[in-house]
Amino acid sequence: MSESTDQYALPADFSDRVFGVLLAAADGAAHARDAQEPGETETLALYLLDGLLEALEWAHDGVASDEAACMWLAALRWYKLVNKSFPEGAPEPQPRWIDEAFAGSPALATGDSQNLLALDNRDMASVGRPLFPQADTTGVLTRAAFVALLPRVDEATTAKIATDAAALTHGSPAAHRAAGAAALVVRAALESGTGSVDRWAALVQEFALEEPADDEAQGTEADANASDSAERHSDEATAGETPDREPVNTAGAGLFRAVTYVRNALAHTAPKAAYDALFEALGEEPDVETAAFATTLLAAVLGTDAVAHRPASEIDPVLDAMHERWMALTAGQ
């Protein structure tokens, strides 16, 4: 991983936006679970971010490191948090600060079942060696949002790390592409706020076809630009979720849905109004992984204001510590 300290200037409020994204992942997941917390969705993303942090620590000390391997070892430590033991035959990495922070925590609310299924293996999955080549669910999205918090690297690096993080549990190339796009969407939001919404539409346009429109809308799709398509599919995504047509929960469909809902929610200038509009769009029983990602995207634009109404949580000390460690190493703050 190549890093530059001067090529990529950080926004003045970068620290607040990073903290907002961390808070939002926990808040969005808890909101979707009717306030059950902590849960697998946000804790796995935090562990994977700590794995990336460990790789950065090694690099800071002049030692070559493999980001994907460090994230896998972190994921194994998360597996132990959930199941009280490591997968049979898998490496047993030494604990880090986050393991101590979560020691004694209650049973976690469930998330994407594919994560535990894939990690229950002695071998590390990768893009070139997928263990579940058909796995394509929304569980890759929140970790991709956290990867976007890495500053001062080029977009190709952001997308690659997010893809590698997704490949640890999900083998489908479509899921890998969605993870890379998700990270770039959040990165754009962190860097340019609402000025990046047209870029979001372009990044996720590939996945719009996963929720097909009715015949009339399909007939005009070829002539629509990315922004118009995003708005059109927003209505289709909501209208299509009927009893005889379940919503598509592939990573790409979840990403497209989240980006569209956040884009529309930002029409409200007040952060709380935008937040409420987002969850109204997500529905009464939203997919937890999609809701968590959507809330992180909102916070990437609005910073901590996006979740300023959030009540105190038992996960807050971990979020505080992660924010402090991350900013100290990546931004010198």
Task: Please name every model-derived segment.
Residues 1-333:
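Structured, active/binding-site neighborhoods that engage oxygen-rich ligands
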